[in-house]
Amino acid sequence: MNHAQLFTVLFDVFCPLAAGYFLRRRKWMTMAQCNGMMLFNVVVLITVMNLLSFWILPLQGDLLLLPLLSLLTAFLSAGMMAPLCRHQSFVDQGTLVVAAMLANIGTLAGICGYILYGELSFAYVQLFAVPQNILMVVLAFPLAQYYAARGGSVGGKAPLQFNLRELLFTPKQLGVVGMLIGLGLQLFQVERPGFVTDFFRMLVHIQAWIAFTPVGYTIDFHRAFHYLRQA
């Protein structure tokens, strides 16, 4: 990594984190605005960037290993965490199992991959990240509700319920649609305009700030140290 790439990582990752934390401390941003930024990132920016990056992704069979490995990693991590935290409260169990299952791969790794290796690297990362995005709504959300219900029930018993249609067919899954459109354009050999490369480069920096500013906003060092002492 050269100095320019290192500076870009600092500017696009740590600066928005610090900005979000500062905005919260100064009360210059509300939680509603923070949630709005996160929704805009997931629904609009990720969809457009997936479409543009997958437009130039070479269609190769071995790329199927990326989503398969992503699913394997998520299930192994959650499976290893579940027995380790079984003696804690149901709420803490749910928190740890869901946290072990998911990772901020799509945003952080996507941006770093683009900075280091270019636009194709961003697409490769999204191939790995998309299964985790689907798992988040199909499995992680129901699991979180399940553990929360067990924590509030008598005897710690609660059913695991979810509506697959309501979970999958939401605006938050538009990123997958963008990916499929991009792959379709690649499949039918539609040439991508040259100006898109510069446009994508601009979107990477915008998306970094839109994505990481809310993360910085939600950082709570006091609660983090509390759980660190428990660990």
Enumerate the predicted regions with their spans.
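Alpha-helical transmembrane segments of multi-pass small-molecule/ion transporters
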Residues: M1-A231
